[in-house]
Amino acid sequence: MANELTWHDVLAEEKQQPYFLNTLQTVASERQSGVTIYPPQKDVFNAFRFTELGDVKVVILGQDPYHGPGQAHGLAFSVRPGIATPPSLLNMYKELENTIPGFTRPNHGYLESWARQGVLLLNTVLTVRAGQAHSHASLGWETFTDKVISLINQHREGVVFLLWGSHAQKKGAIIDXQRHHVLKAPHPSPLSAHRGFFGCNHFVLANQWLEQRGETPIDWMPVLPAES
């Protein structure tokens, strides 16, 4: 069955491509020269570690990792326990409070429990220099994450893609909307959330789609590992 394929199966060849090796080398060289890069090396590929290809039900595309101390840990929009919840994620929580009965905003921004349920929290660029947004945007990560999206499109069926903002929507242009469920809205950033992210109902619609397919819906209440 297709959904038994792993990321290793489908990405092993891509990871040998010269552009990808160059990307890794550039990041490694910057780290070795004393530049602070987020997330830490061990966390760069956490999106794939926590959500195996065969388990992907929902894809949420981010853009850049957070560039503040201790924030980024390899999952889009998520921050480590003990770190203040960033504004875009607070707006996601606000939308959840307004649309999911019983949802109460957690006091943390750690989304591993989403990832463990099949929500691929994928940034389109996987590293960033401290304090410098988009500083690694041209290193080759976009090529790699384009490939990831095309592989999900090809090997999975019925995945919900939540595309927030123009960057994610351009990135998701290759998705076959006959084969997958594509939902679009403005970005949850405070700059754009009031233009239609609030009220988009995406978290509810994603679960309705999954239930129609006979799949377990996502429990959108983020739970810290010690609580689960």
Swiss-Prot record:
PROSITE patterns reported in the protein's UniProt record: U_DNA_GLYCOSYLASE (PS00130)
One GO molecular-function entry: uracil DNA N-glycosylase activity
InterPro entries for this protein: UDG_fam1 (IPR002043), Ura-DNA_Glyclase_AS (IPR018085), Uracil-DNA_glycosylase-like (IPR005122), Uracil-DNA_glycosylase-like_sf (IPR036895)
Location in the cell: Cytoplasm
Keywords: Cytoplasm, DNA damage, DNA repair, Hydrolase
UniProt-listed GO biological process terms: base-excision repair, AP site formation via deaminated base removal
GO CC terms, sorted: cytoplasm
Active site, renumbered: 64
Main location: cytoplasm
Domain of life: Bacteria
Record-given protein name: Uracil-DNA glycosylase
Family label: Belongs to the uracil-DNA glycosylase (UDG) superfamily. UNG family.
Gene that encodes the chain: ung
Role noted for this protein: Excises uracil residues from the DNA which can arise as a result of misincorporation of dUMP residues by DNA polymerase or due to deamination of cytosine.
Pfam families, sorted: UDG (PF03167)
Annotated transmembrane regions: none
Catalytic activity line of the entry: Hydrolyzes single-stranded DNA or mismatched double-stranded DNA and polynucleotides, releasing free uracil
Enzyme Commission identifier(s): 3.2.2.27
Assembly and oligomerization: Monomer.
Gene3D superfamilies given in the database record: Uracil-DNA glycosylase-like domain
